[in-house]
Amino acid sequence: MHIIFQYPIVDLRDIVSGGNGRLNDPKWPDPQERRQSFVSGFGKVKSRNLGGSDNFTGESYYCDSHSAIKFKELQHQGFSEGITTPASIFNSYRRYYNDGRFVGKVEIGLIDNLEKIIRNYPGSEGIQISSILKHYSNLEATVEDEQVKLYKAGPRLSKKYQRESTLREKHFQINPDYVQTGELTIVLTYSSHERLIVPRRSFSLEKIELPNDAGSIELFGYKLKQDGYPTKVWIIKIPANFRSKSGKHKTILRDLRMNLLRIHLEKETIKILLNAIKYKQIELEKESAEAKQVNAYFEQTSKKLFRKSRYDIKQENLLDFALQSEKSMDKGSFNSLKENITYFQDEFMLDNLGKLVGSMAVKPMLFVCSNPRDSNFIDFDKEYKDLKYNLQRAIDRDHYDIEIELSVTKDEFKDILDRYKPQFLHLSMHATVKDGLHFEDKNKAILPMSVKEFKQIIERYTKKHELKLVLISACNSKNHAKAIKEYCDFAIGTKAVFPVPAALIYSNNFYTTLFNGYQKDLEYCHSGAINAIEFNNPKFDDLDYKNKKIRVHEIPVLIKNSKYV
């Protein structure tokens, strides 16, 4: 089993006036330059035994950084839970890479014999990969004479790098804002075995068929949480006999691992650069060499990030998960930031940066309820609690912010949208074909909102804000959904009276799927929800559909914006 911990380190000192005491050559301008020592205290540039990958020539050399992070008796700290003989770590590496500008990373690799033990000492008890990840994430190492667990080592390594790359007489002037660490990511590769169990909350991202009918490589995404530290994990499952495969097959695996690590590093670097500009940690003058350097990096990297594939590895299906960030940026902040970075003129690049920030941003969701007096009671509390419960258990639980507004009047609706700025809007209320959506007035009496009025409010809102989804959980609301289809990505309404039990099943299943990595596949969320209604066959007393031509699971209707048709 091979586990890689990647710690991005972004050095902004090249684009900060004054130099800040940085050594003349602590960076890595050319991988061929391996004669000089690299960063004092980190190590020296060496050749890789495997020569890197055909597609990543810059990986042919690395900085051996054993002096930066140290372990004690590492070989005896292998995984032991649920097996008769503890695993041992028989190989490890600690490496620093740098692109010669401001992008760096420390990668720690651990290779154990757990798979060999499982094969030689068979048993019936399953071994959770989540337990293996927790074990190795909690290994202790020494950085700058301090003990630290691996999943918390990033800031220490960043501090160590900054210190070792600064002139001694300038150590007292070190500014931690100029060298920052990005979020940790982990890549775990294992051979398929019935006892090794992929985490229940992981989800499949890609399946790569190997040449010559040699099986397939499967890729899963997973969020590992420890003490409030969420870590993005890539789990790669390879065929059981993969070790005996040809060099071409192994190159595919290496390229996949490198691509995952590079996407993460590029995303973290862009995030740190944007935040540094936003909070004025760095100030770039138009047409300056520093502004041009940042502009060039943004332009090149944003193009690479949004390609459909890179080095023959498809990355389209990976990006939703890859571009998520635990320390999110606010998309509104990016819009105001864009107004201030006038030295960035490339609209295509700015559009890509906007998409990247959108992927990293927390998605605001607003739950709007209205239940005028003399209407049948709607149990909003049940629907909302189910929604929150599903979010807490979900993979993407940290990427949605849910707000609820009860007893909303017709006059308040517009102002509530402006206040919360939702990307996902859920309306739960009664409605009729003749009158429209049943909002309340100030006396809690019914005050309907027509299709025309609803359209005008949504049209106005989307001139300033993005709406990905409007879900109208109300009877006979198809016309309202249809009227706003050009102002949001997707709208969901109903084409008949929608019984409450069926509505609860739909909502529960739709959001469970959405929160588990499918925010860009709302059609998939919708189809799963209507299937759940059909399979559950909910009982209800308010209507008898036996003599109707329409079936209950056919009542919810998904309407697409024309750009998706």
From Swiss-Prot:
GO BP, sorted A to Z: defense response to virus; proteolysis
Name of the protein in question: Probable protease Gilli_2517
GO molecular function, one term: peptidase activity
Alphabetical keyword list: Antiviral defense, Hydrolase, Protease
Group of enzyme by EC: hydrolase
EC number: 3.4.-.-
Superkingdom to which the source organism belongs: Bacteria
Coiled coil start-end: none
UniProt lineage: Bacteria, Pseudomonadati, Bacteroidota, Flavobacteriia, Flavobacteriales
